[in-house]
Amino acid sequence: MTRPNNSTLKNVAFYAACFTFSVALFVALAAAGHVYPFGDNSFLTNDLKYQYIDFFAWFRRVLLGEANLRYSFSQGLGMNTWGLYSYYLASPFNLLCALFPADKLTLFIFAITALKLGCIHISSAWYVQKRFDLSKPAAFLLSLSFTFCSWTISNLRNPLWIDCLILLPICAYGCHELIRKRRMIRLVIATALNVMFCWYTAYISILFLCIFVLIEFVDYVAEKGFSWKLMLDRALRFAGAIALGLLLSAWTFLPTILAMSKGGPVLALGPLLKTSLKSVIRGFLPCMWVSNESTPQFYCGIIMMLLAVSLLVNRTVSIKTRIATLVVTIILVASSVLSPLEHIWCGMRVPNGFYSRTAFLLSFFALWAAGYTLQILKDQPKLRQAYRPAVILPLLALTAIELFANAHVVWNQLYAGYSENTNRAYVATATNTIATTT
């Protein structure tokens, strides 16, 4: 039997530290905001209270053998529930609800949210280390900024969307491998899992990957040279990888789309602009998000955003890569400002609530750009001193404090005033209703 080498143990310890730190920061946020289970402010708000808790109560009964996954009278007059399952409940984290009593479903939601944040930190740290060969402190800082970006913190009310942030870094590295090494398998598997866990956010992710893979291609040809044969080969491989991923997951998303295609608001004429310039600017700043003013959730840590912006003016980077980076950034910002672009990202439908659903893509792109910048700093003797742990660790501490403060401000708007005692009664009613109608 071979023993794990020292490098393996260090990696395990690093990823364990990423997971533990994010979970601890999440728990500290709940304690500071007096959010359940550390206070009377309920963790159930908006859709979590009025939709998800009913679904989780039903799904728990399914897992315990007390209800049928395919059919439920609790849906009204009785209907097939496969569409409900594949859209709301397909995340593997939801299997844990069977371990919680019916009256502790709020605690279950809190627990899986903590687990998901820890997994986002792990996957994004793995990505920047693999893609840019960054040191562990640098990878920790950037991945923490992505994990606790404003979009994530303000959208914990939609737990089905969060799984996408775990898989997006893996998909992105799959694009890198496809362009550089012609390998497709990672992108195929990650795409299939993304669709199976939540096809709605997977659709958004796949559209983004169609743009992101072009960035990786431009960066590659800036280094190796362009040819039409190369472009055709990589385009066919990318299309094939996405198609295979969709084929592997078709058993879950095709019935769902057919079940849900009969309803929902379709495209309609409306204002061209979704928000104001003032709100866009506020969206990039810490502690400035306002829930009722259509503020896009662009903020993802000042250090990471500054590193990302510095890529655009770094002359050691190919002008083609810098121009492509600027174009993609403009597209992602415009997607939260212009209604036609928002409709494209949302499946040609008018989204109902939860403004700026694609802002997490800009945060991830900032992660990529910041990682690219640090990779360059690491390779330049004159700038290498700024890359030392003695410099990065204090910046990491400041980033953690800054992200915590921003999240605290956001949570005070989202969770204050929602009494856990009131919501506990609602959960009990929902559980009893589900039990008597399934």
Where are these regions (language model features)?
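Membrane-interface coil-to-helix junctions
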Residues: 24-124, 144-166, 204, 260-265, ...
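Membrane-interface junctions at the ends of membrane-embedded or membrane-associated helices
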Residues: 1-7, 130-134, 176-186, 216-233, ...
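Membrane-embedded helix bundles of polyisoprenyl
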Residues: 113, 117-127, 131, 136-220, ...
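Membrane-embedded alpha-helical segments of multi-pass membrane proteins
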Residues: 111-119, 162-170, 206, 299-304, ...
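Periplasmic/ER-lumenal interhelical loops and adjacent helix-loop junctions
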Residues: 46-59, 78, 92, 230, ...
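Hydrophobic core of alpha-helical transmembrane segments in multi-pass integral membrane proteins
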Residues: 18-30, 305-309, 330-334, 394-407, ...
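Membrane-embedded alpha-helical segments of integral membrane proteins
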Residues: 194-196, 357-365, 378, 385-438
